[in-house]
Amino acid sequence: MVNLLFLFFIMSFFPNNIFDYDQQAITDLLITASLKILFALAILLIGFWLSKRLQKLIIRALRKSNLEPTFISFAGNISYYLLLVVFFVLCLAQLGIQTSSLVALLGASTLAIGLALQGSLANVAGGILLVLFNYFRVGERIEVAGIEGIVESIEILSTTICTYDNRLVTIPNKQIIENNIINHVGKPERRIDLVIGVGYEEDIDHVRSSLQWVIDQNSEVCTEPAPTIALGELGDSSVNFYVRPWVKSEDYFRLKLQLTEAIKRKLDEENISIPFPQRDVHLIQPETKELDIKAA
């Protein structure tokens, strides 16, 4: 079967009136066909080699730019297959096969596939944008599309986030690009915002010095920018102080809890009251009227 197919393939290089040729003419045609096949194979082999070489060069160059490994691998594979398609078309042209119809067929197929997979292609485009513009990296804390957690992986079609309660959430890249992205560790430092309410009867300077003592005792609080401790507002039931220290972004959640607890302990130690809203309810009893009931 294979021999017959090969024979038909060789016969395609000959004209329809092959049997009218003499032996020398047939020999010349066979040599010409063999040379075309050899040149086509050479083009194909060179194409494989150059495609692989170009893939390695692109991957090596992209690794120096600190891009995500997922994008580097994707770019390398795309360059490899695109160049391979070019050499395959050249190989067919060398064999005398009309490539214009083949290119048109490939174009139509690409269009049909694109229309069928437009959602997936949008996710691919989103993945490329995420990596190129470096909105976030693997291991960073982000919040997007109502999901908050640590980035586990950035793939071509989707991004996986591990929430704080250890759930894995996979979000399509198209949805990420179309929503606001909050990167909690995008900057080296981050500010903790605490509102501490104390009673109106408390001495303001005493409260401020107590809060400052708590901040000074924590060596992980940044000295630059300097922390802010100020009377922020007079509330309905408390005097509210704004406590705003700066910490390393990766320590934000842990230090926020530590400082909140330390402030509560210090205020208790200094007998500084922390009021809470109270509501007094006054009941007004209506006056009762005596009714004369007369017997009928």
From Swiss-Prot:
Keywords: Cell membrane, Membrane, Transmembrane, Transmembrane helix. Disulfide bonds: none annotated. It holds the Pfam family MS_channel_2nd. The keyword Membrane applies. The keyword DNA repair does not apply. One of its GO terms (cellular component) is plasma membrane. It is found in: Cell membrane. It is a multi-pass membrane protein. The chain crosses the membrane at residues 1-21, 30-50, 71-91, 92-112, 113-133, 142-162. GO terms for molecular function: mechanosensitive monoatomic ion channel activity. Gene3D superfamilies: 1.10.287.1260, 2.30.30.60, 3.30.70.100. Belongs to the MscS (TC 1.A.23) family. This is Uncharacterized MscS family protein slr0639.
